[in-house]
Amino acid sequence: MPFTASAQPRKQRLSLYAAPLHLRRKLLNAKLSPELQKKLGVKRLPVRRGDTVLIMRGDFKGVTGKVVKVDLKRVRIFVEGATRTNSRGQTVYYPIHPSKVMIVDVDLSDKARQKLIERRKRGQHGSS
């Protein structure tokens, strides 16, 4: 989904930085595990609080945990197990970009999310 028709990198970056929150949700897409891809029929979904993810890159590579918080403004997620100690000695969650995680368990309690999956599944099968 292009935010701008321009191919210029500066305009691409600007459109990402200036994107409204309702469009930033699309930037939170993360890949699904191969088992979930077969089960649900889609390749990626926006990450939500309650999903279980596996961190694929960075210092916390290999850590699996539930998503505790999603920061739309900064396009980052916070995962149980990915923590650090701040200067006050408190344990805080480390922000992780959603492209660096893989969803291993999806929270399907929301009917709107189930409709999204059905809609995307139809779109993928219709185009082939």
Curated annotation (Swiss-Prot):
Which GO terms of the molecular function aspect are on file?
Answer: rRNA binding; structural constituent of ribosome
Gene3D superfamilies listed in its UniProt record: 2.30.30.30
Keyword field: Ribonucleoprotein, Ribosomal protein, RNA-binding, rRNA-binding
Q: Which GO terms describe its biological process?
A: translation
Got a GO cellular component term for this one?
large ribosomal subunit
Q: Does the keyword Cytoplasm apply?
A: no
Among SMART domains, the record links this protein to: KOW
Q: Can you state the subunit structure given in the record?
A: Part of the 50S ribosomal subunit.
Q: Mind telling me which HAMAP family this protein's record contains?
A: Ribosomal_uL24_A
Query: What family classification does the UniProt entry report for this protein?
Result: Belongs to the universal ribosomal protein uL24 family.
Please give the function described in this protein's UniProt entry.
One of two assembly initiator proteins, it binds directly to the 5'-end of the 23S rRNA, where it nucleates assembly of the 50S subunit.
The protein here is known as: Large ribosomal subunit protein uL24
Q: Which gene encodes it?
A: rpl24
